[in-house]
Structure formats: structure tokens, C-alpha cells
Amino acid sequence: MMKLKSNQTRTYDGDGYKKRAACLCFRSESEEEVLLVSSSRHPDRWIVPGGGMEPEEEPSVAAVREVCEEAGVKGTLGRLVGIFENQERKHRTYVYVLIVTEVLEDWEDSVNIGRKREWFKIEDAIKVLQCHKPVQASYFETLRQGYPANNGTPVVPTTYSSSVSGIR
């Protein structure tokens, strides 16, 4: 299923969830520092770069495209961390590891909407994400648990109380 919204086509899976893809962009293979970007809706908040998949687009291709647009980085795509559900917002996001090999000086979202990017130590990234993006904070817990990147990757359902979900 597809829906048009302004300049983009949104794709949905059979359950009506928006299909999304994102990357945990690490500075090196040691995976000690991760790149977060400022939210387009709340520029004072940090988020994991990612977004909606285009029609017929593979999740891995969408993830690489989204991080280039939102964070201005390119790199080596690694393992699939997992597929995460945000039941409150009806999103299903494929999350990958990306080892950054190139940092662009100017990129699409920096030019168009003034988006910023910043490197965070993992613990600090979890802290800044927990209050307003708890599903994104859970990406790191799943990464630590080391689920294999294969067809058996579990869908990780996440639900949070309405008091938390009202904070975007």
C-alpha cells in the first residue's frame, strides 16, 4: 500500500505499518561513537537518522539513502540489528549498522532545513534518546544482545505508555 504526502510516497506493509529504514552510524568498527542528527520537528532533540522507504526499495538501500540525506554520511553497510515496531505511531523500521567512511561537508538536510549532526558515546546517545525516542534507544539494547542478521531476526515490538508516547 502507498500514500502520497507532499513530495514523497509513503509505503506501508500488509499490517498497515509505515515501512522505514535507519542506520546506527558508527565512527569506526569499534562501535563506540554513534552519529545522531537533530530532529526536523524539534531541532533541540537528537534522533537516529532514518525515514520512509520508497516503493519497491529494499530496506538496506533505503537505510543508506536516508542517512546520506539526513546525516550527510556514507559508509559500509553492516548487519541488520533488527526490525522495530512503534505501535503508537504505526511504524516498522529496519535498523542496520553503518561504519562511516565519508563525512560530507554539505548535505541535503543541512542545506534545506538546517539539520545538525553530532557524534555521541553510546551511553550518552541512549540517554538523549530515552525520554523522547524510547524505541530508538532500544536499538542499542538489541545491538548489545547481538541478534543475528538473518531471516530469523525477531520483530521487536515496543509499546510505551501514553504519557511517554505523547512526547515527540
From Swiss-Prot:
Mg(2+) 3 binds at residue 66. Signal peptide: none annotated. Mg(2+) 1 binds at residues 50, 70. Present in heart, lung, liver and spleen (at protein level). Widely expressed. It comes from the Eukaryota. It catalyses: diphospho-myo-inositol polyphosphate + H2O = myo-inositol polyphosphate + phosphate; 5-diphospho-1D-myo-inositol 1,2,3,4,6-pentakisphosphate + H2O = 1D-myo-inositol hexakisphosphate + phosphate + H(+); 3,5-bis(diphospho)-1D-myo-inositol 1,2,4,6-tetrakisphosphate + H2O = 3-diphospho-1D-myo-inositol 1,2,4,5,6-pentakisphosphate + phosphate + 2 H(+); [phosphate](n+1) + n H2O = (n+1) phosphate + n H(+). One of its GO terms (molecular function) is 5'-(N(7)-methylguanosine 5'-triphospho)-[mRNA] hydrolase activity. The active site is at residue 69. Mg(2+) 2 binds at residue 66. Its EC number is 3.6.1.52, 3.6.1.61, 3.6.1.10, 3.6.1.62. Gene3D superfamilies: Nucleoside Triphosphate Pyrophosphohydrolase. The modification N-acetylmethionine is found at residue 1. Transmembrane segments: none annotated. Its cofactor is Mg(2+); Mn(2+); Zn(2+). Keywords: Acetylation, Cytoplasm, Hydrolase, Magnesium, Metal-binding, Nucleus. A motif (Nudix box) lies at residues 51-72. GO terms for cellular component: cytoplasm; cytosol; glutamatergic synapse; nucleus; synapse. GO terms for biological process: diadenosine hexaphosphate catabolic process; diphosphoinositol polyphosphate catabolic process; RNA decapping. Its main location: cytoplasm. It is found in: Cytoplasm; Nucleus. Residues 17-144 form the Nudix hydrolase domain. Monomer. Cleaves a beta-phosphate from the diphosphate groups in PP-InsP5 (diphosphoinositol pentakisphosphate) and [PP]2-InsP4 (bisdiphosphoinositol tetrakisphosphate), suggesting that it may play a role in signal transduction. InsP6 (inositol hexakisphosphate) is not a substrate. Also able to catalyze the hydrolysis of dinucleoside oligophosphates, with diadenosine 5',5'''-P1,P6-hexaphosphate (Ap6A) and diadenosine 5',5'''- P1,P5-pentaphosphate (Ap5A) being the preferred substrates. The major reaction products are ADP and p4a from Ap6A and ADP and ATP from Ap5A. Belongs to the Nudix hydrolase family. DIPP subfamily. This is Diphosphoinositol polyphosphate phosphohydrolase 1. It comes from Mus musculus (Mouse).
